[in-house]
Amino acid sequence: MTFPLLPAYASVAEFDNSLSLVGKAVFPYAADQLHNLIKFTQSTELQVNVQVESSVTEDQFEELIDNLLKLYNNGINEVILDLDLAERVVQRIPGARVIYRTLVDKVASLPANASIAVPFSSPLGDLKSFTNGGSRTVYAFSETAKLVDVTSTVASGIIPIIDARQLTTEYELSEDVKKFPVSEILLASLTTDRPDGLFTTLVADSSNYSLGLVYSSKKSIPEAIRTQTGVYQSRRHGLWYKGATSGATQKLLGIELDCDGDCLKFVVEQTGVGFCHLERTSCFGQSKGLRAMEATLWDRKSNAPEGSYTKRLFDDEVLLNAKIREEADELAEAKSKEDIAWECADLFYFALVRCAKYGVTLDEVERNLDMKSLKVTRRKGDAKPGYTKEQPKEESKPKEVPSEGRIELCKIDVSKASSQEIEDALRRPIQKTEQIMELVKPIVDNVRQNGDKALLELTAKFDGVALKTPVLEAPFPEELMQLPDNVKRAIDLSIDNVRKFHEAQLAETLQVETCPGVVCSRFARPIEKVGLYIPGGTAILPSTSLMLGVPAKVAGCKEIVFASPPKKDGTLTPEVIYVAHKVGAKCIVLAGGAQAVAAMAYGTETVPKCDKIFGPGNQFVTAAKMMVQNDTSALCSIDMPAGPSEVLVIADKYADPDFVVSDLLSQAEHGIDSQVILLAVDMTDKELARIEDAVHNQAVQLPRVEIVRKCIAHSTTLSVATYEQALEMSNQYAPEHLILQIENASYVDQVQHAGSVFVGAYSPESCGDYSSGTNHTLPTYGYARQYSGVNTATFQKFITSQDVTPEGLKHIGQAVMDLAAVEGLDAHRNAVKVRMEKLGLI
């Protein structure tokens, strides 16, 4: 509840600043004073009210409506109007905040919660009853009321409207001074059940942050109002002038009381070390949230060390503006509750930096919010043209996948389908590359510029875990690698097979004498520092760690760095750590996504910079890999682009339906954007039905059935007549995994584009994923037309050399000079010419 008094002024020019602690004022309405009234309202913390005192003609009514709209929309709190005029205004201005000035016999016709102003001469019992137990605000007005009338009215819960010239903040008045002490009006509204007669008093700052709890008395309150400072009642020492000895003084901004009138709130401006005797701002502990951030930024504005990020923001207007726009864009893109909260906090930080830079306080921001809430008319609210984009034509929405019902692939008979239908069936789920790049770029830039700090923040944001360090260094603790014996044996066997296959790929040095005296060579050298990305996502994939780590070790890479997102408790899956130990990894970056890729590409304080990055991942990982590869400052290459996992199975009537379906589902469970394709060669409807039944029956038994259901919804069975037709379509599709469950395996020779081929009924794709020895890091999304899967050579680069003897120069020298002359490169020609001249060859 506010101070129980409404001072009335003849104009804003007569405002008495000593009465500002009352917190409100009322001024007369005058059309020619509208500008001054609005200007005053926008410059003060007071609740400003307006009183329309004179009658209004019909000609003046429309002008009044227009002016009241301006007043409301610029922060005027309430308008006092005669009953009839008020009712007309409310009809014209929905939401108009009015105080009905009326006589007591008219009050019953008004809404029970409508604010009213009635004469002091009304019976006090009636006035008190009009408050409806506190749900209605009742004002009383008179030019002739006496102090005893005012105090008794206030004691009944009524707010008097008093000419400000009759009010004073003094309380020891001579008999000839006919003014009302503001303190007596306040005291009349207070009650206490304490034996000592004191009033519990909460002290708060202008932002409503509690500083401490004290006591006030009938002596301290008048003195506080007179001095406009924090004066309280000490139970041992009498009046307590806050800060009189410590220097931590208080300017009294306002006094409020609670709904029962037995507790006060002093709103103050605190100076010095703070309110608390422990030299803290508050007795209730440190501030948090926006207030704490504001205090820190105002301190940094004066004291930030050179080179600090906040100092950069204060000094670099372009950087600060760019960060505000960047964070606003990220907030607009955020979808989850956690991401929205995170991005909003970032935006608040940079916005508060700008406020602090230009001397704008949170109180001023909140004042503007409060004023906006008082508007009764609204703008249309459209964004400015520069912030809107022409709406693209509505794309056909993907069909909604039912959460129940039969799980089955779409079916197409190639002999009856159009070429467009076939093309659509083989089209992968759309990857919105441009949008993904826009999301990834700020992440990559953040890590590049801010290193470990950004990496830790992004891990907290995306993985939900706060880490002290982003790196787990080798040697890795034994307790982090504890595995069941069967799992350890499986990993060891898989590592051994992958090692054997990749060691066999090591190439001998190639040496060719192209003509007498000219020997050309090619030899392999390992890439020195490699970064291996091990995905997390919907499934933990420790197998990827061995598929990347073993070839890196075989190739002889000197520095192997793993990166994998941590679990919610900050740890990694022990299988990944065990493999890292087995392949001699230097460290494991505890991060996933684009931030992990950026850390390995550019290096941070703790993450070594890598020369090449390997490994599959989601669309954000792929976008980050492609982004850093195209940044010449990163000097970092990648193994290949990657997309969602996929399989194409070619099966004939001799294939076991259960085998076929198990291969399809083993890829479908990777993710909802995975795709599986079945090319059914010369199958009857009955044979196809057996496969369809097996799809549903096996799928519903899987723990990841909901992922499978959504993947199968955009996957297809295509019926073809011949093996040749199936292989042609497979080469067109260029699958990551190609499985041939056909009677005659000789068709392998016709495979032109595939990441890896699995031949025969007993070669499930799962074997290649784990233990057969081939690598499971393969090109997806059709990139098998241009890229190989990861192999030993992927971790090497090949250097050529040539050794030319005088005899060799005799054979090729003239040809070199002639070609250099054709290209106009005389220095090239001369490098051969001077040698041949000294040899006497020309």
From Swiss-Prot:
Record-listed Zn(2+) binding positions: 667, 670, 769, 828
Gene Ontology biological process terms from the UniProt entry: L-histidine biosynthetic process
Biased composition (Basic and acidic residues): 390-403
Cofactor: Zn(2+)
A GO cellular component entry from the record: cytosol
Region (Disordered): 380-403
Keyword NAD assigned: yes
Keyword field: Amino-acid biosynthesis, ATP-binding, Histidine biosynthesis, Hydrolase, Metal-binding, Multifunctional enzyme, NAD, Nucleotide-binding, Oxidoreductase, Zinc
UniProt GO MF annotations: ATP binding; histidinol dehydrogenase activity; metal ion binding; NAD binding; phosphoribosyl-AMP cyclohydrolase activity; phosphoribosyl-ATP diphosphatase activity
UniProt remark on cofactor binding: Binds 1 zinc ion.
EC number: 3.5.4.19, 3.6.1.31, 1.1.1.23
Pfam families: Histidinol_dh, PRA-CH, PRA-PH
Cross-referenced InterPro entries: Ald_DH/histidinol_DH, HisE, Histidine_synth_trifunct, Histidinol_DH_CS, Hstdl_DH, PRib-ATP_PPHydrolase-like, PRib_AMP_CycHydrolase_dom, PRib_AMP_CycHydrolase_sf
Domain of life, source organism: Eukaryota
Positions of the UniProt region annotated as Histidinol dehydrogenase: 358-842
Gene3D superfamilies tied to this protein: 1.20.5.1300, MazG-like (1.10.287.1080), Nitrogenase molybdenum iron protein domain (3.40.50.1980), Phosphoribosyl-AMP cyclohydrolase (3.10.20.810)
Pathway: Amino-acid biosynthesis; L-histidine biosynthesis; L-histidine from 5-phospho-alpha-D-ribose 1-diphosphate: step 2/9; Amino-acid biosynthesis; L-histidine biosynthesis; L-histidine from 5-phospho-alpha-D-ribose 1-diphosphate: step 3/9; Amino-acid biosynthesis; L-histidine biosynthesis; L-histidine from 5-phospho-alpha-D-ribose 1-diphosphate: step 9/9
Cystine pairs: none
Reactions this protein catalyses: 1-(5-phospho-beta-D-ribosyl)-5'-AMP + H2O = 1-(5-phospho-beta-D-ribosyl)-5-[(5-phospho-beta-D-ribosylamino)methylideneamino]imidazole-4-carboxamide; 1-(5-phospho-beta-D-ribosyl)-ATP + H2O = 1-(5-phospho-beta-D-ribosyl)-5'-AMP + diphosphate + H(+); L-histidinol + 2 NAD(+) + H2O = L-histidine + 2 NADH + 3 H(+)
Positions of the UniProt region annotated as Phosphoribosyl-ATP pyrophosphohydrolase: 276-357
Region (Phosphoribosyl-AMP cyclohydrolase): 1-275
Residues annotated as catalytic: 736-737
Family: In the C-terminal section; belongs to the histidinol dehydrogenase family.
PANTHER family per the UniProt record, alphabetical: HISTIDINE BIOSYNTHESIS TRIFUNCTIONAL PROTEIN (PTHR21256:SF2), HISTIDINOL DEHYDROGENASE HDH (PTHR21256)
Name listed for the protein in its UniProt record: Histidine biosynthesis trifunctional protein
Gene that this sequence comes from: HIS4
